[in-house]
């Protein structure tokens, strides 16, 4: 329940990403009184970062060493690449944590400003969608890590039951110091590698969930602007007149000035968010085609049914990640361009020349759709189709060499 002074959106604001962010010590927060981050957040971050770095370095190294065996190499490269990208995501958020906290506060101010029931209902709907998508990502990632962790245990139990030779393997193909796989230390190593996978899941569910939530909140902010524009002309009751009076034009200009201020604040926030996410989105998309391609090849080449099930979970999580970035970016661009459509449908032709200039200024800026653009591409649903097509082409090419 929210306090009586809080809007309805407060209960849903970054609900799922906040949980993941707190677990890895990266949720943008400050100590009351303007201080730095809590000490326990630093400890959690150091542990999570160390676990993910060890997994990324060890698994990628294992894949490079075993390039002569494609199946074994791909089994190491798939989770290793994901962890390597997560190392980057964790570092970007840690390095600029104060700036991320400022962005959260700015977005909160934008969404908290409108307390109308209609506006809050719309924002809660978008926030619910964002949280459900974030939960889907967290669930698919957790299922993938559980599959990697349980597969060696199940196979080891089966060998013990039927009295086959062999020992329990580690959950990931990874290069470790020799002492880490000694019988006395092996259980601890297994637990730490499981923790490495869990930290990876919480890391990307936080960062990617933060992105999709931010994008849908920006979409909601642009829709608030659209509602404000409709209300300006609806409150005038100008259906009975052919031309607005001077008083009506003055009222329109006064209220449009407030709309312009909010619109500019949203665009500035979107620009700053894009600047912060540029490296993260770029590296995620550059690695996406490789991850999808290698995962599908793993499923095709692997003869173990358990391994196949594990990589089916993996590809679901990878596709969910990619979809969230494209879905969020697509919503931002469409909602920003919709402001111009709403404004054009209003009775602007009844305004005087001075008021029309204000309307034209908003119209021209809105026609340039705001996007979460990074070098070489913009996250959108067409970009998702392009990446899936590229991954399919890579698979077709590699199959000719197998």
Curated annotation (Swiss-Prot):
Transmembrane segments: 43-63, 74-94, 135-155, 174-194, 202-222, 277-297, 308-328
Cytoplasmic face residues: 1-42, 95-134, 195-201, 298-307
Domain of life: Eukaryota
InterPro entries found in the cross-reference section: 7tm6_olfct_rcpt
Location(s), subcellular: Cell membrane
Stated family: Belongs to the insect chemoreceptor superfamily. Heteromeric odorant receptor channel (TC 1.A.69) family. Or1a subfamily.
Name this polypeptide is given: Odorant receptor 22c
Provenance organism: Drosophila melanogaster
Gene, per the UniProt record: Or22c
């Amino acid at each position: 329940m929210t306090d009586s002074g809080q809007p309805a959106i407060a209960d849903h604001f970054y609900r799922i990403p906040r949980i993941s962010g707190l677990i890895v010590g990266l949720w943008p927060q400050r100590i009351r009184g303007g201080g730095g981050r809590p000490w326990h957040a630093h400890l959690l971050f150091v542990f999570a970062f160390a676990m993910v770095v060890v997994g990324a370095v060890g698994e990628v190294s294992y894949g490079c060493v075993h390039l002569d065996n494609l199946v074994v190499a791909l089994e190491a490269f798939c989770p290793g690449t994901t962890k390597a990208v997560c190392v980057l995501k964790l570092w970007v958020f840690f390095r600029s944590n104060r700036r991320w906290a400022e962005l959260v506060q700015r977005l909160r101010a934008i969404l908290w400003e409108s307390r109308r029931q209609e506006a809050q209902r719309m924002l809660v709907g978008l926030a619910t969608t964002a949280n459900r998508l974030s939960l889907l990502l967290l669930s698919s990632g957790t299922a993938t890590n559980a599959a990697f962790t349980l597969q060696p245990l199940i196979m080891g139990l089966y060998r013990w039951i039927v009295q086959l030779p062999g020992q329990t393997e580690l959950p990931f193909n990874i290069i470790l110091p020799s002492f880490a796989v000694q019988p006395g230390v092996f259980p601890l190593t297994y637990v730490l590698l499981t923790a490495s996978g869990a930290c990876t899941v919480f890391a990307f569910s936080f960062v990617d969930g933060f992105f999709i939530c931010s994008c849908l909140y920006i979409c909601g902010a642009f829709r608030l602007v659209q509602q404000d524009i409709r209300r300006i002309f609806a409150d005038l009751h100008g259906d009975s007149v052919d031309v607005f009076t001077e008083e009506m034009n003055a009222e329109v200009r006064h209220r449009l000035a407030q709309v312009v201020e909010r619109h500019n604040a949203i665009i500035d926030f979107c620009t700053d968010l894009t600047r912060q996410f540029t490296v993260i989105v770029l590296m995620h998309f550059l690695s996406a085609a490789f991850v999808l391609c290698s995962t599908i090849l793993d499923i095709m080449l692997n003869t173990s049914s358990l391994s196949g099930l594990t990589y089916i979970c993996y590809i679901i999580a990878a596709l969910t990640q990619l979809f969230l970035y494209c879905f969020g970016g697509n919503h931002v661009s469409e909602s920003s361009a919709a402001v111009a459509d709403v404004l054009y449908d209003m009775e602007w032709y009844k305004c005087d020349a001075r008021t029309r200039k204000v309307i034209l200024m908003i119209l021209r800026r809105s026609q340039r759709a705001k996007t979460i653009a990074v070098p070489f591409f913009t996250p959108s649903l067409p970009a998702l189709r392009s990446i899936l097509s590229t991954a399919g082409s890579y698979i077709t090419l590699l199959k000719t060499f197998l």
